[in-house]
Design a protein with these regions (language model features):
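C-terminal beta-signal and terminal closure region of outer-membrane beta-barrel proteins
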Residues: 4-6, 155, 632-633, 717, ...
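Short, acidic, small-residue-rich periplasmic hinge/interaction motif at the N-terminus
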Residues: 37-116, 124
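Extracytoplasmic beta-strand/coil segments of soluble accessory domains associated
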Residues: 99, 127-173
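N-terminal periplasmic accessory domains that precede
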Residues: 123-126, 154-157, 185-190, 211-232, ...
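Short acidic/polar hinge/loop motifs at secondary-structure boundaries
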Residues: 173-201
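Surface-exposed, low-complexity loop segments enriched in small/polar and acidic residues
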Residues: 180, 272, 281-289, 338-389, ...
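Short loop/turn motifs that connect adjacent beta-strands in outer-membrane beta-barrel proteins
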Residues: 224-227, 240, 256-259, 400-403, ...
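C-terminal beta-signal and adjacent terminal beta-strands/loops
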Residues: 517, 796-798, 879, 925-942, ...
């Protein structure tokens, strides 16, 4: 039966592909016939777009978007004169090609004018300022990572649903992912040729396929650019860092009477980044807002006082900059830079208990407040990753018949970044022998007096160089396709087909990182024949050199090269994406209320990856053998995980998908009395090689009411997100867990298990229901120049892919959650019991809120001033963002308004532009509302607190202020070809609010708050 199933499925795929090929051959044949009928005549307008969702005119898909921001709007109600009937008008969010069609899905538009006025070196920054974008990643995120490779990766998150649930397109086409989660890097796009960016704030899986749960961000390039243009820009912060140097150029020219068009672009961008601070609380280059804000746990849950207290200047008391004895009779003995012992200042009245547990009386669990903060490592994380990016782009298009084009594009890009996760290499819980020759004599004597032979020790390891992570991402993308129109059955049909092959290579190299087995052997020193050597004879034979971690003395070169090898961890990942698409659209039928529009097509895609790591990180394997760079070493584990930080492991996987879709728009009403209305519906059937068949659909409509300028719109959809390569085929990581509880025995027993973190190839796609209702006010007679829209949205995502810890997996199976029971075997017939930590389709997300957009344009001559003024404001209010783990006993959490996350209650963007003659002036406001650390907390004061629970812990304060930023800029045209410009972001140099955690870290939400401070941009543009 399985073989029959596979054969039938394969045959079904072949039939679909054959049908698609037949459609395209018929289309090309019709076009070729048109060419035979007569020579092509040059057209004064651009041919139809090369992607099925792109208009040739830069038109707003939302009437609330003013022309100053979205580009000049075509008159969609009156076709231009001539036989062609005008270019097709297509809006992102729909595959329909029809003049005058208004999609029911809201779309926000950023045109080339607004992108230029914002003067950002990466268009990504401008787009993420839209309120509907929440939780996007960029140069200020992932700066504490050692092995993710996502440092500096620019990716969008709509509605706070995450980058993996936002589909990003280039000219309506998919782009190979920049890492194994499948999200592309916007900084690798040809940015100078971007004509506009459409942001679809609603589900679009029926039109575009997987990942379009939160919406779609579509970058639309100018495919018929003529001439030459260039841009050179620089900038830096008010602190003198993150220096920017940007060079961009593009050229385009037509040949053969306009039938052949060639365009190229290239750019180089350097952003210097903001370095990490050092130890303690000193930030880089004079920034002053960091104060080690921490939620300290009092350990009290039922004494009438808050369990958690917000404390500034918190310090972890398990280590210091140059070393601290953390338990036993010598607890509280710290060491200065010269290795001399002194009593450590714990602050907050802390007194070491000098017991085996390392308790500090007068302090909180794990933390004291104040005292000697010099060893804190939290601020030692890079604040913004430096980035060097370069890309080149080329496109060649040839009109083989009027309004029919074949084309090819190539895009090659590279992004280099780096970051420092933390200073030194903090170590806690170390055991140092009192006889260690590096231990000062007076401490050795104190050991003897106390009757101990060793002590517990912690250090920030300030004697070691800082970890230096270097990820490099390279992209190679090739697209070939054809699009155009032909006549069939008395009407015009538009076709579009393309094949894309994309390659992304990510290389991660880490410098200055400890090899743990070498470090552990090096710190255990002894004296042999009058020389200080490593105590372990096997390690000595393998080249061990002793390391003194007591004090801040210089580390000898041979010791440093032993504990920090010249060749640190590396990880090489190669991803490929192949995609084919063939679609057609037309108007096969005309009703009294207007033409019925139809679009349909087939798509196929294959995704694959392979990652290879070093043998010390991954373990020895065929792909990761020992070598001269990583020689065999008896002290190093052959199963991997030997480095101080990071997960470096081999892995591979692939899947393919084939899809068919159709969309129809039916105008069913058109009268002066009742206005005009249409129904838009789409469906998509998708077959994944990993999870089978799933459907997505959309139904919506618009009603242009009889009240001029007022339109109502509504849409509801079922959207999907398929599991990505990382979730399906994650590289395995294995660790041994002792004292694991087996709930299936009576009484419960403890056993040693092998914990394997792996992918789950049985994952199913996430499904979502997305509903939006809106009203649009556009240029009414009573309010000329004014446009506005209001849209309510509601999204529920089911089967959200999430991960549980090993013990919870086993416990839930015991409690009856049977889908988890295949993930472990605690009583195998042979071998070690194991638990596989995998992702499962267990959780759900619910979010709801509304978007508001308004704009006003006016000529200032009516008030006696020159020029033209445009005002635009966009706002998003998140009413709910509820995440339910979907497991027994777990409580759903609403994070709307939690400014420690991605979804503040309100987010607003306001822009005001004044254009007069050669001068253009811009003001911009960016704001999000005050919020809380988390909605799960119960605020109370000492004496009136309820019982604190894991789901609803008590806290003394729960306020997290928002941020208001003011930007100002302008440009001046020296000539028709030459323009200078300047802009200041965060004019008033507003600092972020701390985002306290229960441990010491950088403690700021870099995805939400501006952490750089005032930034100056300046540049010059040339265009002819």
């Amino acid at each position: 039966m399985e073989r029959l199933h596979m054969v039938s499925r394969s045959a079904w795929r072949r039939r679909l592909l054959a049908t698609g090929a037949g459609v395209m051959l018929a289309a090309w044949g019709s076009a070729a016939g048109a060419q035979v009928a007569g020579p092509p005549a040059p057209s004064p307008v651009s041919p139809t777009p090369t992607a099925p969702n792109l208009p040739t005119t830069t038109q707003s898909a939302d009437p609330a978007a003013p022309p100053a921001l979205a580009g000049p709007a075509a008159n969609t109600n009156t076709p231009p004169s001539g036989d062609q009937g005008g270019p097709d008008i297509v809006v992102t969010g729909s595959r329909i090609t029809s003049a005058g069609f208004n999609a029911p899905t809201p779309t926000q538009v950023l045109g080339a004018a607004q992108l230029a006025k914002n003067a950002e070196p990466n268009i990504f920054t401008t787009v993420t300022q839209l309120p509907s974008l929440q939780g996007s990643t960029g140069a200020t995120t992932n700066t504490n990572s050692t092995s993710s490779g996502q440092q500096g990766l620019s990716s969008f998150s709509l509605r706070g649903l995450g980058t993996i649930r936002t589909l990003t397109l280039l000219d309506g086409q998919r782009v190979v992912g920049a890492n194994v989660t499948g999200v592309p890097d916007i900084s690798q796009f040809p940015q100078l040729l971007v004509q506009r960016v459409d942001v679809v704030t609603g589900g679009a899986s029926a039109s575009y396929g997987s990942d379009a749960v939160g919406g779609v961000v579509n970058f639309i390039t100018d495919k018929h650019f003529e001439g030459f243009k260039a841009n050179a820009a620089g900038g830096l912060t008010t602190y003198g860092d993150d220096g920017e140097a940007l060079l961009q150029a593009a050229a385009g020219k037509s040949f053969l009477d306009g039938r052949l068009h060639v365009e190229v672009s290239g750019e180089y961008d350097h952003q210097g980044g903001v370095p990490a601070g050092g130890f303690g609380e000193q930030m880089a280059n004079g920034r002053h807002w960091y104060n080690t804000a921490t939620l300290v746990n009092t350990g009290q849950t039922n004494n009438g006082s808050p369990q958690y207290l917000l404390k500034d200047h918190a310090q972890a008391y398990q280590y210091t900059k140059y070393g601290l004895i953390t338990a036993g009779p010598l607890q509280g003995t710290a060491f200065d830079v010269n290795g001399r012992p002194f009593p450590f200042n714990y602050g907050s009245g802390g007194v070491p208990a000098r017991n085996a547990a390392g308790t500090v009386n007068g302090c909180y669990v794990g933390f004291c407040v104040g005292g000697d903060l010099s060893g804190n490592v939290g601020i030692g994380t890079t604040l913004q990753s430096p980035i060097d990016r370069a890309n080149g782009y080329g496109r060649v298009g040839f009109d083989f018949a009027p309004d029919n084009e074949i084309y090819a594009t190539v895009n090659v890009a590279q992004v280099k970044s780096s970051n420092q996760p933390n200073p030194g290499a903090s170590k806690t819980g170390l055991t140092i022998q009192c006889a260690n020759p590096f231990v000062p004599a007076e401490v050795q004597q104190a050991c003897g007096n106390a009757g101990i032979t060793s002590f517990q020790y912690g250090t920030s390891n300030a004697i070691l160089p800082n970890i230096d992570v270097h990820p490099t991402r390279k992209q190679y993308r090739f697209v070939g396709g054809a699009d155009g129109r032909f006549g069939l059955l008395g009407t015009d049909w538009h076709y579009d087909t393309y094949y894309e092959h994309g390659i992304n290579i990510t290389d991660i190299h880490v410098n200055n990182i400890l090899l743990n087995p070498h470090f552990n052997n090096a710190i255990q020193a002894t004296t042999l024949n009058g020389q200080v050597v490593c105590a372990n004879a096997t390690a000595r034979a393998a080249g061990c050199q002793p390391l003194n971690i007591i004090g801040g003395g210089a580390v000898p070169a041979d010791t440093l090269s032993y504990v920090i090898p010249e060749n640190g961890p590396f990880q090489h990942t190669r991803q490929t994406q192949d995609a084919f698409s063939a679609s057609m659209s037309g108007e096969p039928l005309t009703l009294p209320s207007g033409p019925v529009s139809l679009a349909f097509g087939l798509e196929w895609r294959r995704e694959a990856y392979k990652v290879v790591a070093d043998p010390y990180g991954n373990g020895v394997s065929d792909d990761s053998p020992y070598s001269d760079a990583y020689p065999a070493d008896p002290t190093v584990s052959t199963s991997g995980a030997n480095w101080y930080a990071g997960n470096y492991h081999d892995g591979q996987g692939k899947y393919h998908v084939i899809e068919g879709f159709a969309e129809i728009n039916v105008p069913f009403l058109k009268s002066e009395r009742f206005g005009s209305a249409n129904i838009n519906a789409a469906g998509r059937v998708t077959n994944y090689s990993t999870s089978g068949t799933i459907w997505a659909w959309k139904v919506g409509g618009t009603w242009d009411t009889p009240i001029e300028g007022i339109r109502l719109r509504a849409v509801t959809s079922k959207d999907v997100r398929a599991p990505n390569l990382s979730e399906l085929f994650a590289a395995p990581i294995s660790v041994t867990v002792p004292n694991f509880t087996n709930p299936f025995t009576t009484p419960q027993s403890q056993l040693l298990v092998l914990q394997n973190t792996i992918g789950n190839s049985a994952l199913k796609p996430e499904t979502a229901r997305n509903t939006e209702l809106g009203v649009v006010l556009s240029h009414t007679p009573l309010l000329p120049g004014f446009s506005a829209s209001f849209d309510y949205y509601r999204i529920r995502v089911n089967g959200v892919i999430s991960t549980l810890d090993a013990q919870r997996e086993v416990n839930l199976c015991y409690q009856g959650v049977t889908e988890l029971c295949s993930a472990f075997n605690l009583a195998p017939a042979s071998g070690t019991p194991y638990v596989n930590i995998q992702s499962f389709n267990l959780a759900s997300i619910f979010t709801a809120g509304f978007d508001i957009e308004a704009s006003y344009q006016m000529s200032l001559d009516r008030i006696g001033l020159p020029g033209r003024m445009t005002i635009r404001a966009l706002a998003t209010n998140v009413r709910h963002f509820i995440t339910d783990p979907g497991i027994p006993g777990a409580v759903a959490i609403d994070t709307a308004g939690a400014n420690s996350g991605n979804t503040p209650s309100w987010k607003l963007l306001g822009t005001e532009t004044w254009d007069v003659g050669k001068f253009s002036f811009l003001m911009q406001q960016r704001w999000f509302s005050d919020g809380v650390f988390g909605n799960q907390y119960v605020v109370c004061s000492a004496g009136n607190c309820p019982v604190s629970t894991a789901d609803h812990p008590t806290i003394d304060t729960n306020k997290m202020p928002g941020q208001f930023l003011f930007d100002i800029g302008g440009s001046y045209s020296l000539t028709k070809k030459l323009q200078i410009y300047a802009k200041v972001d965060n004019l008033f140099n507003k600092s972020p609010t701390g985002s306290p955690q229960t441990n010491t870290g950088i403690d700021v939400n870099q995805a939400l708050y501006d952490t750089l401070g005032r930034f100056y941009h300046f540049g010059i543009r040339y265009n002819f």
